Amino acid sequence: MKKYVLPLLLLGGCLCLSGCKAQRSYEPAPSVAAPSVTALEQPFRQMSGNPDGMALYSACTFSYGGQDWAVESYVPAELMLDGELMLDDSCHFLLRVVSGSQDAAVLLDEQVQLGAPAADVWVDGQEQLHVTLRDVRTACYQVTDYVYRPERHAMVGSTVLDASGINYVGTTQR
């Protein structure tokens, strides 16, 4: 043991004198766009039943302004098996808000590559209805907050977060 003490002390002294520093991890600059100031207006239109060839995947029903409402998510009917989505690399999603009068405003209607969009419903302190759309894909993370405007009978949205060119890793959500 004594024969190793001197070499270890010399090695430690050399490292101190040479300016050995702790390594730092690389943190790339975020590629997040500034929130949008442009309003996205989605008017309510008369719609009844499921869209052609689509099946209801999930829904959030709630009451607002004395009426029953729902946020509905649809996928191609052939991808549903016993109420479960057989998700492939690419899937067509349709998300819409249905008001008490059966009018609907479509928030998303597109093919999604490696992802599954979702929506959250909430009411703020001024009693305004919000539907927050989370469109998460492998290389994209976009959050759009839609607010119901009764005077226009429309959902008016603004982009809260728009990150593209990212590498989405995962979530704790089930």
What are the roles of these predicted feature ranges?
Residues 16-19:
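C-terminal motif of bacterial Sec signal peptides marking the signal peptidase cleavage site
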Residues 1-4:
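Positively charged n-region of N-terminal signal peptides that target proteins for export
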Residues 8-10:
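Small-residue packing motifs within transmembrane alpha-helices
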Residues 21-174:
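Exposed acidic/polar residues on beta-strands and adjacent loops within beta-sheet cores, strongest
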